[in-house]
Amino acid sequence: PSKSVSLGDIATASMFGHDIPLEVTETHMSPLSPPPYMVGAAEVEVDTETSEVKLLEFDACVDCGTPINPNLTRVQAEGGILQGIGMTLTENVTYDQRGWPMENSLMQYKIPTRVDVGRVRVEFENSYEPNGPFGAKSIGEVVINTPLPAISDAICNAIGTRFYELPITPEKIAMA
């Protein structure tokens, strides 16, 4: 007698009595990791009385190969730029004598919101990368790191002082 079991029965049996379902994962690893490129330009306004920095506009152009999902690529770029703006202007972690972070909630750890930044414009220079999946390159790191030099240079251009530690706070600007 021949016995057979359907794939559906196997899937159901694999989950019965288990909290974790059966899972299959596939990844792509290129032999080379071609770098993405990005250029960023920031326009800032520095209040000479309060030393507050207002980011009026941030423009960027990103070459991340061929975007596999253009909408998600744009959101990734805009979100990373916002993280880079926060790293540059507001985000700071300090520690108490025991080594515990003093900024233990979003009330103390200041991340920028949409009202804290002006216009953010991102364009893409599409290219085909033969070593990437479907012609794509990475995008995550380049969009976070580019706002720092652009904003820092804009502040230096406005007040004539270059800063070498982050974040560039109004207190640091006032003491410059």
Label each region the model flagged:
Residues 1-176:
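C-terminal catalytic domains of large/alpha subunits in multi-subunit enzymes
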